[in-house]
Amino acid sequence: MLFRSGELEECLKKAQAQRFRIIVTDGVFSMDGNAAPLDRICALAEKYDALVMVDECHSAGVLGETGRGITELYDLRGQVDILTGTLGKAFGGAVGGFTTGRREIIDMLRQRSRPYLFSNSLPPAVVGAGIETFKMLAESHELHDRLVANVEHFRAGMMAAGFDIKPTQSAICAVMLYDAKLSQEFAAKLQDEGVFVTGFYYPVVPKGQARIRVQVSAGDRKSVV
């Protein structure tokens, strides 16, 4: 069942008659850039005997002191049953993704997951590049530290210029424009200047909450940001 923020415990109570329960959440919500309250989610999972699955697409490589994701941010490593992620964002912009978890869960997915069974294998070059990216992030915090500094610099500059920008715990910065047409015009003019951003408006976001979404990169020099 789907749940809104603050309704999870009620949903878990209703699901007590079920044999299995699993809570599925994003690590970082892609429209606002805010992190899921994973500490509270894991506490409820333990209370109501539920598994926890987190999509780390926007949080792996970004959140936490060393970029190891939302479980590092909340000091919950080993307490999430299934983690999914992508190689298409923080880990180099390639194709493909990954799922991690206990061996019995992964073994079952290899046999029963239709998307996995009917997908082609990743090209060896992509796998090799992904492995090297993980090694780079494990050996040095330089890129992660640069990302954090760039996000702080971007937010400070935008707010100083008078823009309304949502709080964020990630590299996603939502610049609020509130008008759907304005968000599209704003995005188009920025692309004319060589800056790629995306304008979002209803129904992707609530009515009156149109915005452009900026994803800050560690690859940008501070002067460019």
Protein language model regions, located:
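Short amphipathic alpha-helix with an adjacent loop that forms part of the alpha/beta core around
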Residues: 8-17
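Short beta-strands and strand-loop turn motifs
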Residues: 21-26, 166-169
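Catalytic PLP-binding core of fold-type I/II PLP enzymes
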Residues: 18, 22-23, 33-66
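Conserved PLP-binding catalytic core of the aspartate aminotransferase-like
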Residues: 145-154, 159-194, 204, 208-212, ...
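Active-site C-terminal subdomain of aminotransferase-like
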Residues: 48-51, 58, 63-169, 182
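Short, small-residue-biased leader/transition segments that mark boundaries at the very start
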Residues: 1-2
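Short, small-residue-enriched loops and turns at beta-alpha junctions
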Residues: 5-7, 27-32, 59-63, 116-117, ...
